């Protein structure tokens, strides 16, 4: 098994002494030997899997005793590559620098690779960036949402997930979630004979088939089966609860248009990822196909990918994943654009985003007028042990803790109890194929 903490990395060793000279320091920087000025003394990465999927946690340490920041750099499919970028490339550039110059450091690291962007570099950058915001909040004695402008709302509405085989079963789960306080519920429907996203396996045999990706995907079966079930769920639960559905980028543009037309009467709060990023040019046609609110973006790795869609007003919700977008520094600018173009945010927050990442989401949720709804993972007891202060919704809403910075800590000793598997094979979930044997998007 792989070690859960990678603190013996080259970055940690190299941080034993702050370099006498900082490579290309900012012109306003104080001398590196000024011991009274706040400095970055170490950048450490940790791997842990208390939720079942691998987390990459970044800790930026300073020369002020006890002052450090945490960031989430988690992409379950490229865990080791992300850790390497932080340890081998970003950490040496950060040693000795002032952690308060977040914008400058973000641009420095982003441009350092020359061939910029992509999920690996962006997740690594996000881990550092969010940790710097955490430090800034702790120095100021303010929670993240106060650094970002202060509260725009008392609490952030969350949505939870339910699934099932039929409308009756799913409707019961929706109403049960509503009883627990959730006003927004994502509903996923099992399609007989096909490997359906977002639904639990019926038995151990099906679970094993899914693990090996021995099943296949059938878009036509999905289109025949799911819309009438969604319409019936709406009839059963009434209009007092919002319903969401995720197509998970598995449809062609023409199939997506058909889906939009067929689910009109289900009155969805939003339909997520009806189109893959590669098919974004078709959103104009999708918008014309019906009035169903459209959400997209969890796969986007650059905030500029949203801009044409916002400008053309063809999406209603930006599904933001802070780690994949490079951290809070670019994401807060995207959130401002979302507001200006009249859309709303719906940040990504399932189990592959750590509690550190969720706390970063909440900083934006509580401070932005453009906030729509926050996806909410059910964090395990083990996860809450590793991350003291893990955000947990109360009656379907996140309130924030009011603690300085992110308000979440990291227990290194507890993290070691939940190592990531070795070798990592988390990307096997994406080995989905169509009935004819061709590769299908996950």
From Swiss-Prot:
It is an enzyme of class 4 (lyase). GO terms for molecular function: magnesium ion binding; mannonate dehydratase activity. Mg(2+) binds at residues 246, 272, 298. Its EC number is 4.2.1.-, 4.2.1.8. One of its GO terms (biological process) is amino acid catabolic process. Keywords: Lyase, Magnesium, Metal-binding. It comes from the Bacteria. Its cofactor is Mg(2+). Binds 1 Mg(2+) ion per subunit. InterPro entries: DgoD-like (IPR034593), Enolase-like_C_sf (IPR036849), Enolase-like_N (IPR029017), Enolase_C-like (IPR029065), Mandel_Rmase/mucon_lact_enz_CS (IPR018110), Mandelate_racemase_C (IPR013342), Mandelate_racemase_N_dom (IPR013341). Substrate binds at residues 161, 298, 319, 348, 352, 375. The record marks 350 as: Important for activity and substrate specificity. It catalyses: D-mannonate = 2-dehydro-3-deoxy-D-gluconate + H2O. The active site is at residues 197, 248. Belongs to the mandelate racemase/muconate lactonizing enzyme family. GalD subfamily. Has low D-mannonate dehydratase activity (in vitro), suggesting that this is not a physiological substrate and that it has no significant role in D-mannonate degradation in vivo. Has no detectable activity with a panel of 70 other acid sugars (in vitro). This is D-galactonate dehydratase family member SSLG_02014. It comes from Streptomyces sp. (strain SPB78).
């Amino acid at each position: 098994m792989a070690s859960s903490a990678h603190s013996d990395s080259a970055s940690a060793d190299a941080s034993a002494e702050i370099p006498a000279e900082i490579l290309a320091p900012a012109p306003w920087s104080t001398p590196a030997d000024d011991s009274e000025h706040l400095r970055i003394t170490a950048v450490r990465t940790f791997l842990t899997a208390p939720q079942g999927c691998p987390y990459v946690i970044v800790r930026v340490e300073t020369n002020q005793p006890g002052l450090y920041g945490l960031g989430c750099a988690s992409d379950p499919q490229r865990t080791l590559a992300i850790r390497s970028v932080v340890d081998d490339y970003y950490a040496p550039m950060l040693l000795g620098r002032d952690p308060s110059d977040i914008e400058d450091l973000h641009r420095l690291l982003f441009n350092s690779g020359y061939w910029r962007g992509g999920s690996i570099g962006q997740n690594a950058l996000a881990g550092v960036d969010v940790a710097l915001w955490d430090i800034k909040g702790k120095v100021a004695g303010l929670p993240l949402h106060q650094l970002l402008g202060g509260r725009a709302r008392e609490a952030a509405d969350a949505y939870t997930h339910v699934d099932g085989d039929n409308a009756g079963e799913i409707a019961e789960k929706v109403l049960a979630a509503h009883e627990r306080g959730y006003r927004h519920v994502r509903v996923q429907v099992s399609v007989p004979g096909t490997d359906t996203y977002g639904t639990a396996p019926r038995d151990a045999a099906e679970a094993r088939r899914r693990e090996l990706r021995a099943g296949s995907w059938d878009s036509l079966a999905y289109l025949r089966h799911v819309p009438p079930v969604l319409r019936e769920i709406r009839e059963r639960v009434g209009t007092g609860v919002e319903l969401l559905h995720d197509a998970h980028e598995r449809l062609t543009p023409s199939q997506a248009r058909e889906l939009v037309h067929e689910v009109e009467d289900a009155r969805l709060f939003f339909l997520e990822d009806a189109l893959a990023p590669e098919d974004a040019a078709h959103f104009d046609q999708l918008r014309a196909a019906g009035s169903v609110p459209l959400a997209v973006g969890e796969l986007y790795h650059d905030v500029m990918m949203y801009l044409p869609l916002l400008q053309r007003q063809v999406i209603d919700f930006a599904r933001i994943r802070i780690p994949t977008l490079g951290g809070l520094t670019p994401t807060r600018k995207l959130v401002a654009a979302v507001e200006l173009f009249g859309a709303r945010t719906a940040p990504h927050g399932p189990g592959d985003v750590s509690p550190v990442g969720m706390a970063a989401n909440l900083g934006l949720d509580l401070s932005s007028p453009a906030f729509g709804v926050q996806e909410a993972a059910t964090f395990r007891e083990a996860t809450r042990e590793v991350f003291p202060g893990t955000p947990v919704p109360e009656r379907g809403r996140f309130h924030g803790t009011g603690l300085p910075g992110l308000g979440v800590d990291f227990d290194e000793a507890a993290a070691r109890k939940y190592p990531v598997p070795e070798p990592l094979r988390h990307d096997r979930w994406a080995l989905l194929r169509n009935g004819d044997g061709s590769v299908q998007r996950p």
